[in-house]
Amino acid sequence: MSLAWRIEYDEGALADLKKLDRQIQREILDYMEKRIAKAEDPRAFGKPLRHSKFGLWRYRLRDYRIICQLRESQLLVLVVAVGHRSKIYEE
């Protein structure tokens, strides 16, 4: 039995979530808690980002993207951004 990963949201990700429709907020939170937190290896569900976002991981949920840092030593998934796929990669 693997240990569960903790999911935390930084201030920017919380602000991003608040801008979204309540239904998609619920879906994102459920996805992170039920799928990613319980995964033995959360990398299996995501994709590593490159270039200016190197070191971050991306999860897809419908047309939305969840950008995270994985801190393996702490078993922590830190969500740093959430948004629609058309805008999430803009800086």
Regions found by a protein language model. Name each.
Residues K34-R58:
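A short, surface-exposed loop/turn module that caps and links secondary-structure elements
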Residues M1-E11, A15-K19, Q23-R26, D30, ...:
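Enriched for short, Lys/Arg-rich terminal
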